[in-house]
Amino acid sequence: MSAKDFLVELGTEELPPKALNSLGEAFLSGIEKGLKAAGLSYAAARFYAAPRRLAVLVEQLAVQQPDRTVNLDGPPLQAAFDASGNPTQAALGFAKKCGVDLQQIDKSGPKLRFIQTIAGQPAAGLLPGIVEASLNELPIPKRMRWAARREEFVRPTQWLVMLFGDDVVECEILAQKAGRESRGHRFHNPDNVRISSPAAYLEDLRGAHVLADFAERRELIAKRVAELAAEQQGSAIVPPSLLDEVTALVEWPVPLVCSFEERFLEVPQEALITTMQDNQKYFCLLDANGKLLPRFITVANVESKAPENIVSGNEKVVRPRLTDAEFFFKQDKKQPLESFNERLRNVVFQAQLGTVFEKAQRVSGLAAYIAERIGGNAQNASRAGILSKCDLATEMVGEFPEMQGIAGYYYATHGGEAEDVALALNEQYMPRGAGAELPSTLTGAAVAVADKLDTLVGIFGIGMLPTGSKDPYALRRAALGVLRILIEKQLDLDLVAAVNAAVEQYGDKVKAAGLAEQVLDFVFDRLRARYEDEGVDVAVYQSVRALKPSSPLDFDQRVQAVQAFRQLPEAEALAAANKRVSNILAKSEDEVPPNVDASLLVEAAEKALGSAVANAESEVAPLAAARDYRAALARLAALREPVDTFFADVMVNVDDAAVRANRYALLAKLRGSFLGVADISLLG
């Protein structure tokens, strides 16, 4: 079957830059979905997206649908006709369903059958509907109307190109009649641009100063920004989201180096970077030591004959913003950091839980408690806790919310606070996302854990649990943050005790009954989710959770040991044996003796098992106490043979009550040795 290239380009006013790439991807996805539904084959398809256009190019698209055969089976012949040969309602109903007379139905087989070959339709007649459906399904939160038209789209449409091979696909979509006239760069080439063929689309527009390929523009910007940064003896900060946004703002990118006064470098560089990136869409430059250089890169959308005018204009625009940051920084430093707590006495953290200052007091107390137990400095943790929210009341954070914690660090350093105290003011918010950086200091870790536990306990304590996708206080992230800090920083904290301490600090503000257990269950459920994401079998998690270790670090060490144990050849048999032992002991009606009486071991197999368990117990106990759980389980794996022999040769429930009870005691010792690490009966 013959095939042609197909191109559709919808021209618009400037599209939302943050959504441009996703709109292009969705446009392509919708068209591919429509082509597949129509049975139209093609070789490849890709999208193009620029500020004023969305386009899709489909290579080697079939010019016509393939013919298809409809084959429908109807009722059996004996049900289709009565004894006189007259058609029944079943036969007539089947013919009606097929849309034909009964005479056109095949009666040669055991059932009525309708066979029809339907000729494929030309692709050119199907493409307008496919394109329109794709545009209607684009993920646009709010569509707009323009002029006196009823059509709706994300932005007013300006032109439409639809070519199938060399021919225009005649149609009208979103108030635009299809043609082959596109438009060039708004300033360099504002006239119409004739698209000679779908394959020539990119080059035709390139000649009109438009790079329609989003990926090409993105790569060009990234490369040129890196080159210019190197020329300035620096490196550029290029967040992927900023690069995407800048790519979506320009059709013909021209990166240029600009500068600002060095006096602004006295302001925290994070504030300068924030305002230049978020407000001006600039790429900031750092020196080899990670310090901000007094230069930045802007990406112009025009190749100017006087680029110095563009540079000068951007420098004038950024100066007031940097001046504002400088002013806020100087104003905030005029008073001690702790004095900002007075403002926080009137700022509500949560209506039922009190003010932000009260939260800082609780965090201070809990951070000191935690620091003592993880080897940190309780006094410094307490100090960091009481200062932890002060910067929320500063001018700097009021203008730049992203500076919370960071501003606190600079103001604490300016005020002569200990380095770990200052760092903790920023580290309290760590990790700021999945896989993000963790606190570098014990003081920071203590404050971060305290802050998150205080939020968890408080919000749970007033019954505002997260439901489904709703988690306004980010409790899931808080729980995962606590777990990451304690596990990845190797901090051995009794979380049960810490949560109870957090509950006590709230007093009568929360309903304390069962609160600690509720919070702990939530946190350890997050740990289960973390392991699932890492590919750990849920049975491994459950085998450890059954023992309810109170320290997340201890919990993780056990999980890693069980993971290793499962790889051993003895694991499956020992897991099954433990499950059998668990069932036997659960059904015991008699009290199980605490110790094994060697004189009551009668059979050779039980004597061998008794000796093996006793030897293993003496070796495993110190290993488990030292938390060398992997070595402990490896040692217990040697019990497989005597365990298998015991169950093969020995009957546990014998008539002799003393012997029976002694065998229960032996099995309890066996199970207890494994329970020092995990309940491996759950691995079956």
Curated annotation (Swiss-Prot):
Catalytic activity: tRNA(Gly) + glycine + ATP = glycyl-tRNA(Gly) + AMP + diphosphate
Gene this chain is encoded by: glyS
Keyword Ligase included in the entry's annotation: yes
Primary enzyme class: ligase
Keywords: Aminoacyl-tRNA synthetase, ATP-binding, Cytoplasm, Ligase, Nucleotide-binding, Protein biosynthesis
Family of the protein in this entry: Belongs to the class-II aminoacyl-tRNA synthetase family.
GO biological process, one term: arginyl-tRNA aminoacylation
Protein name: Glycine--tRNA ligase beta subunit
InterPro entries assigned to the protein according to its UniProt record, in alphabetical order: DALR_anticod-bd, Gly-tRNA-synth_bsu, Gly-tRNA-synth_heterodimer
Gene Ontology MF: a single term: glycine-tRNA ligase activity
Signal peptide start and end residues: none
NCBIfam families the record matches: glyS
